[in-house]
Amino acid sequence: MDNRTSKQNYYLDIADSVLERSTCLRRKYGAIIVRNDEIISTGYNGAPRGRKNCSDIGTCTREQLRIPSGERYELCRSVHAEANAIISASRQSMIGASLYLVGRDAATNELLSDAMSCAMCKRQIINAGIDRVIIRITPTEYRTIPVSDWVENDDSIFSF
């Protein structure tokens, strides 16, 4: 009998560690891209290189403007975890890969059971050639989303 952690939870555990580098004051996300059991890249949400992070300045623009979660991401100082992971990899290495995503509330550190890539990240994931996104729901449970679903159900990318 094999008592080892499943590969999915192994990679989700790594994404959970990556999110500890997040500088967002609202939500912390970690992402890793894996192809053929090899980690291609990692990413967490934070300001673009060389710019001040929300954690450095001690304020969140979206919070100051009372923008609800899931809206008006263009006003966010951060680059999302998925985007940072994609930026750090070559497209060739991502074709057919899986993206593992974990989100936590920055204040409570509780898992976000409803974590989901935003519309902008979904478009980047599609264009990167990634096949599926695995999102942690609980410490041992996850959901798998075939990226082809986002392509076939074009309107679903824009549902909020």
Locate predicted features.
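Short secondary-structure boundary/capping segments within folded domains
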Residues: 21-24, 32-34, 90
